[in-house]
Amino acid sequence: MISKVLVANRGEIALRVIRACRELGVRSVAVYSTADRDSLHHELADESVCIGPPPAASSYLNVPAIISAAELTGADAVHPGYGFLAENARFAEICERVGLTFVGPSSRTIAKMGDKAEARETAAAAGVPVTPGSDGPCESADEVKRVGAEVGYPLVIKASAGGGGKGMRVVEAEAEVEDAYLNASREAGVTFGDGSVYVEKYLRRLRHVEMQVLADSHGTTVTFPERDCSVQRRYQKLIEESPAPDLPEDVREGLMDASERLVGSLSYEGAGTVEFVYADGEFHFIEMNTRLQVEHPVTEMISGVDIVAEQLKIASGGRLEIPPEALSPDGHAIEFRINAEDPGRNFLPQAGLVEVYNPPGGPGVRVDSHLYAGYRVPPHYDSLLAKLIVHSRDREGAVRRGLRALDEFAISGMETTLPLHLAVLEDEEFLRGGVTTSFLAQRNLESEGGLLRLNVIGS
């Protein structure tokens, strides 16, 4: 078993990893920027090292500082969490070269799946359905036009090196290709340092469904029940749930089989998530995230498996010993991302002093957060403040529990997305289940009696 893990992250995920280490008897090292000197992960870890000033480029993305911290403290492994360096193949390679165990797949696998065009080719070669589109990157607007002539419009141009909506443009007709190609390529180059793009057929009414996998070095792969992540804003997930509501059993089985085929073709090790779109009764591969997901607690709640602990065991060379019953969903779980954003003012980012922090409790309620009363939320990083996860015997019960827990959750000192989640849980379409990724885009947020309400545009 690895003996000391440096956690190359901050916030709630750093706390999550440190707690898993404690339960396994593994010592932990926190790294922190000067903006996070009062952070809980800095306090809870066995050791901590300041790695730089507030900007992420000078701290949490500062590879030499992180490697030096590992050497200084005698850490023998690095857990990257999510975001920052979690899917940076170069960082994983450096860890490998200096003898640090990277808690995740190999640098080669990260690089292969990090190039979205190559990942698409890899999936197709493994027999996984992919959306009709280009074979690899498109080198010119003319290539995009050729794909359009073959598969039809609309198309979506995507950055090969990234995600999150950056370097992405929807093209409705051939006349739009030139500008869309140039703009997508330019944005991809600025954001990811790589301007290459590829093209897929654009599907309008789709759901975002993903499969959580674990794989060890002994050839064992475990695939958990699917998560539905369709409630999004500008390609950023806000609510995730498992199992996916109103999903045919044959589709569920197909998603599991496709995920296992892809993971098997990669000789994968660690935790990963295979992401798909589901539309018109068919599913297609989007990408594979070679890291722990923000929404991993949803799977933990319905399976009883500690995914972070399993990551650490796999990295230590251990075998997966997950009972078969953990792979069938035990009830229903929903996760709500509580962000420091004002939904009433176009999700304006928030920062400042947390005056009151009172998380909910009770049966089937979990809160993963780094907040406390008196904590000052810095403006330099991701807006995630907390994750509220609720679990019940069925979806209806999980929704009721979510309404109660959200109403009980008190954070003051800044605006948050708590009111938005309450509004979603009162929306009739969401309650029916199976909403598409355009769910929020089709609605206006309006204040009514001091509460937010979602109203369908044009209704």
Predicted regions and their residues:
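Acidic/histidine-enriched active-site and ligand-binding environments that engage anionic O-linkages
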Residues: R146-V156
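Conserved beta3 strand of the protein kinase N-lobe
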Residues: G133-S134
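ATP-dependent carboxylate activation and anion-phosphoryl transfer catalytic cores
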Residues: I2, V7-V26, T34, S48, ...
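ATP-binding N-terminal substructure of ATP-dependent carboxylate-amine bond-forming enzymes
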Residues: M1-A125, C138-R146, G397
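A generic structural signal for short coil/turn motifs at secondary-structure boundaries
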Residues: A57-S58, I110, G167, H296-V298
